[in-house]
């Protein structure tokens, strides 16, 4: 598909990955109007582009760029592609005078930090978190290099997305073993539902000013056992190892100041949003 003159949505790079598929279903089902008007990238998508190569022409002007494209696992060399993909997106935006550019980073940049984690902090504890922090730095360097031609760019430190993370994958496969800490609870994590994510992205695309880095989560930390119960999943406990992380919590004050109030995360709400975006319990 070639964008039409009525194209008013963003260009979404990496639209065929897990998160992209969830957001596209929301768009196709009418839950995310801006996504329905978007130009969806993929090697065989609306906008076909191998991001390792120069970007082909855009026939219409999209309203901003959302970069979902990324590498989540592999060797440090493979994970370094996250920075390369970010640079490619920024160069396309600079070439065609597009913006803002929203790039998906990760709460993994906070590692084992105790929350609420703020955007001024970063202490990655694994290769993926380090790769995402390197990507953020690469974005800042590329913006400086591009100078006056640089687009506005914001790296979003994304929480777990309901329906797209390891817990929901394990639920779908009916293979869930949950760590239980000595206090009797399981891990608590920062989450965002896919519909809430889509709405926040739309708000950020229209924001007049954006910081270089921004946390993206619904307020609060959700007990994983509550998610399992809300989904009707089968699971069992195991004693939490010493290396297990009890809680990840993101500070969302800056997000609320820019995008407006975001509903506090609840297990039933997250499961409902995951199902709306196509997730199913096997």
Predicted regions span which residues?
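N-terminal Rossmann NAD(P)H-binding glycine-rich loop of SDR-like oxidoreductase domains
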Residues: 2-32
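Short-chain dehydrogenase/reductase
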Residues: 13, 79-83, 124-136, 190-191, ...
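NAD(P)H-binding glycine-rich loop region in Rossmannoid oxidoreductase-like domains
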Residues: 46-88
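NAD(P)-dependent short-chain dehydrogenase/reductase
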Residues: 142-190
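Mid/C-terminal beta-alpha module of Rossmann-like enzyme folds, strongest
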Residues: 198-252, 274, 279-282
